[in-house]
Regions:
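Active-site region of glycoside hydrolase catalytic domains
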Residues: 1-43, 67, 86-88, 96-449
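A common structural microfeature
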Residues: 7-9, 56, 73
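Catalytic domains of carbohydrate-active enzymes, especially glycoside hydrolases
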Residues: 58-79, 281, 285, 339
Length: 449
């Protein structure tokens, strides 16, 4: 029988620009996603986060929904430009008060907040000054973090500095598919380094001002070689260094993986060793976002990594084209334990986009593929705990169907369906399944489907 610890956190996750809506309300400033989504052709169907899930106005209803599901934690991000419209300087009291009210509502309903300080929505005013390419951003970010700590740390016990810095740099500075839309092999390493420096400065600020726990959230995608050939194994190591170790090695070990200099060549800056070592600030946990794995082969013609993904026959794939492979989540959590000294881990995002069929009788929304996905992956988390990984919580991505970045509203990750015309929320079967898992501390995972 599966049984999770009594103090295990069961949560859902969202991010500010994806669910809040009203991005310019009450004195807020524009972010790079406000700018990016309003640029023609960059987001599918011309979608924006102007309304999204209208969480800015409906947050009390959403908190009540979380309570009905039985969750005891909620991970959300704060919008930097809602709090500091120009990214620095004058504080927008109305924006800060929104998060103050949200935290109070969560706690009043027995839900522990986990606050992420940055989930991709950089203030546009700072992007105009170079954004993540400007070394001064580490100070700007630490100052913003301090504003949030002073306002909320008396009630918020878990903070995350950054969400998925790899996506910020890969999508925003290397390939240009995400805001701010740059495409440069030279810019990506600089943005990555400044993100990590900003993380370190925020952790330092927290040690001076905070009283609880702080960490970082990374997306990990384990790489498996397609064969035992030296070429496939080397390609797999390059892909792993680029996506997985590029961020965790500096955070935990104070150094970058050696493969990055090979990958980027002349575009890789030779950072002073003492500067890189400063990224290694003691943190209290690491958040792991996991969605899929990658089977990797050598490809001489593939740009940058000389590596390519190998599609798997007979595998199930999500609507975003990601293979469903739960064993890799166990492997990932155990790998973090072994490589980085068994830190406290939270699975801060895990979920899948599947096509939701029409409602059944009584507004029931059956999403059996998502139910199966959650069953397998939550079971995989338990398997990692059984192997000694210090996993303390699990957050489904996502509570709500929401704005899925450059894909607009075309992909639905929510365990709660959102009608974007009416804003009606309808729990799917996956939400009801998750509620039963929580109530049984995992016991229902082994029941027949």
């Amino acid at each position: 029988m599966i049984e999770f610890p009594r103090d295990f956190l069961w949560g859902t996750a969202t991010s500010a620009y994806q669910v809040e809506g009203s991005p310019l309300a009450d004195g807020a400033g524009p972010s790079i996603w406000q700018r990016f989504s309003h640029t023609p052709t960059l987001v599918r169907d011309g979608a924006t986060g102007d309304v999204a899930c209208d969480h800015y106005r409906r947050y009390l209803d959403d908190v009540a929904l979380m309570r009905r599901l039985g969750t005891n934690a909620y991970r959300f991000s704060t919008s930097w430009s809602r709090v500091l419209p120009r990214g620095r300087g004058t504080i927008n009291a109305a924006g800060l008060d929104f998060y103050d009210r949200l935290v109070d509502a969560l706690l009043a309903n027995g839900i522990e907040p986990m606050v992420t300080l940055y989930h991709w929505d950089l203030p546009a005013a700072l992007d105009d000054l170079g954004g993540w390419l400007n070394p001064e951003i580490a100070k700007w970010f630490a100052d913003y973090a301090s504003v949030m700590f002073r306002k909320l740390d008396d009630r918020v016990k878990m903070w995350a500095t950054l969400n998925e810095p790899w996506v910020v740099t890969d999508g925003g500075y290397l390939y240009g598919a995400l805001a701010p839309g740059h495409r440069s092999r030279f810019e990506a390493p600089i943005a990555s380094h400044n993100l990590l420096r900003s993380h370190a400065e925020a952790v330092k600020a927290y040690r001076a001002e905070g009283r609880h726990r702080i960490g970082i959230v990374v997306n990990l995608e384990p790489k498996y070689p397609a064969s035992d050939s030296p070429e496939d194994r080397a390609a797999t190591q390059r892909a792993d260094a680029y996506m997985n170790r590029q961020y965790l090695d500096p955070v935990f070990l104070g150094r970058y993986p050696e493969e990055l200099a090979e990958i980027f060549g002349e575009a890789w800056p030779r950072w002073p060793a003492d500067e890189v070592a400063q990224i290694r600030q003691p943190i209290d946990f690491v958040g792991v976002n996991y969605y899929t794995r990658n089977v990797t082969r050598f490809d001489r013609d593939a740009w940058l990594l000389q590596a390519a993904a190998v599609p798997q026959r007979r595998a199930t794939y999500t609507e975003t084209g990601w293979e469903v492979f739960a064993q890799a989540l166990t492997d990932t959590l155990v790998w973090v334990k072994q490589r980085y000294g068994n830190p406290a881990i939270y699975v801060t995002e895990n979920g899948a986009a599947f096509f939701d069929p029409p409602a059944l009788e009584g507004d029931r929304l059956a999403d059996p593929l998502r139910v199966d996905y959650l069953r397998k992956h939550i079971t995989a988390v338990h398997a990692a705990i059984a192997q000694g990984a210090d996993v303390r919580g699990y957050f489904v991505w996502s509570l709500l169907d929401n704005f899925e970045w450059s894909l607009g509203y075309s992909k639905r990750f929510g365990i709660v369906h959102v009608d974007f015309e009416t804003q009606k929320r309808t729990p799917k079967d996956s939400a009801l399944f998750y509620a039963k898992v929580i109530a049984s501390r995992g016991g229902t995972l082994t029941e027949p489907a």
